[in-house]
From Swiss-Prot:
One of its GO terms (biological process) is chromosome condensation. It comes from Lytechinus pictus. It is found in: Nucleus; Chromosome. Residues 114-123 have a biased composition (Basic and acidic residues). Residues 104-113, 124-210 have a biased composition (Basic residues). Residues 17-91 form the H15 domain. Its main location: nucleus. This is Late histone H1. The keyword DNA-binding applies. Belongs to the histone H1/H5 family. GO terms for cellular component: nucleosome; nucleus. PANTHER family: H15 DOMAIN-CONTAINING PROTEIN-RELATED, HISTONE H1.
């Protein structure tokens, strides 16, 4: 039994005696329902009456909770500055700020998605351009390789054309030989002329007979 008592004491120490200060402040303002807002003193009185709290020690935490509530939008300061003055709940404004945050987050997400799409489109365009340029370069290189063997093949054609010209030049002297033989034939006719002179001699014999 003596060992079980310390365990129950530890559980009592671990359990908080009151909720967080911000929750107590909101509860005080909602319970007071003052049109002009609840003052810091009224909030302290409500917390001291409804919660087991040392209000002197909790005063600094209450001031911090009020300032933080105004900054977050959960509270609205109607009068005064800082922790002094009167405060109301700012649920409507808080809801608006949350909605605005959600809208801003949605807009940011849309902008991010658009930027990603634009980047992807630009990347695709650059890739397509690079591929086209690479294809053009490859086609030009292939065309150059095809043109070089064609130029080499033309040179043997020129050599083949020159050889028939040499044969034609060789045939021309062969055609001149018959022309020389034809020129020799008139010489044979000249040798036949003395034969005619020899035929005239019998006429001289006829004169002697007379």
């Amino acid at each position: 039994m003596s060992a079980a008592k310390p365990k129950t004491a530890k559980k009592a120490r671990a359990a908080p005696a009151h909720p967080p200060t911000s929750q107590m402040v909101v509860a005080a303002i909602t319970a007071l329902k003052e049109r002009g807002g609840s003052s810091n003193q009224a909030i302290k009185k409500y917390i001291a009456a409804n919660y087991k709290v040392d209000i002197n020690k909790q005063a600094t935490f209450i001031k911090r909770a009020l300032k933080a509530g105004v900054a977050n939008g959960t509270l609205v300061q109607v009068k005064g500055k800082g922790a002094s003055g009167s405060f109301k709940l700012g649920k409507v404004k808080a809801g608006k700020t949350e909605a605005q945050k959600a809208r801003a987050a949605a807009k940011k997400a849309k902008l991010a998605a658009k930027k990603k799409e634009q980047k992807e489109k630009k990347a695709a365009k650059t890739k397509a351009r690079k591929e086209k340029l690479a294809a053009k370069k490859a086609a030009k290189k292939a065309a150059k390789k095809v043109k070089k063997p064609a130029a080499k093949a033309k040179k043997p054609a020129k050599k083949a054309a020159k050889k028939p010209a040499a044969k034609k030049a060789a045939k021309k002297p062969a055609a001149k030989k018959p022309a020389k033989k034809a020129a020799k034939k008139p010489a044979a006719k000249k040798a036949a002329k003395p034969a005619k002179k020899a035929a005239k001699k019998p006429a001289a014999k006829k004169a002697a007979k007379k």
